Amino acid sequence: MLFRSDSLVFAIQKAIQSTPENSIRVQATIAAYFDFIEADGEAFRLLFESDMNVEPAVRERLNRMTYDCAAAVSAVISLDTGLPQEAAMLLGVGLIGSAQVTARHWLERDSKLTRVQAQNLVTNIIWRGISGFPRS
């Protein structure tokens, strides 16, 4: 699973580069998280929800993965809104955190919502929030 964290970063970068349309970027980013989590749910649970994540090397890898994903998102936010990098990074971390936590929740609960329904709900709430920032 540790090497797969690089595949998540790549998937997020690919989602962002896939289109200039920000609503589709958000949708693709959320889908990338659900893909990542669903591909190997047991390994994901072990890594994120067990004592493994207190190990310094594992924790560092998880933090790096989150930072790299948020940095990819924040670059677009900063460019589109003119927000300073620090503010854009905070929003990027929030967006990535929301995607990660909601995808985990969906997986953990063996939800009656289909994956597509869950992704659409999360995409909708995140897009409605981030799209409120004026473009520069």
Where are these regions (language model features)?
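Hydrophobic alpha-helical connector segments
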Residues: 14-39, 95, 119
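Short, solvent-exposed positions on alpha-helices
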Residues: 20, 24, 45, 86, ...
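Amphipathic alpha-helical interface segments
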Residues: 32, 36, 40, 98-105, ...
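Short secondary-structure transition hinges
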Residues: 24, 28, 35, 39-71, ...
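Amphipathic alpha-helical linker/stalk segments
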Residues: 1-28, 73-76
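Short, flexible helix-adjacent loops and helix caps
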Residues: 13-20, 49-52, 74-82, 104-111, ...
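Amphipathic alpha-helical packing segments from all-alpha helical-bundle domains
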Residues: 4-10, 56-79, 89-97, 101, ...
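Charged/polar, low-hydrophobicity segments characteristic of intrinsically disordered regions
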Residues: 128-136
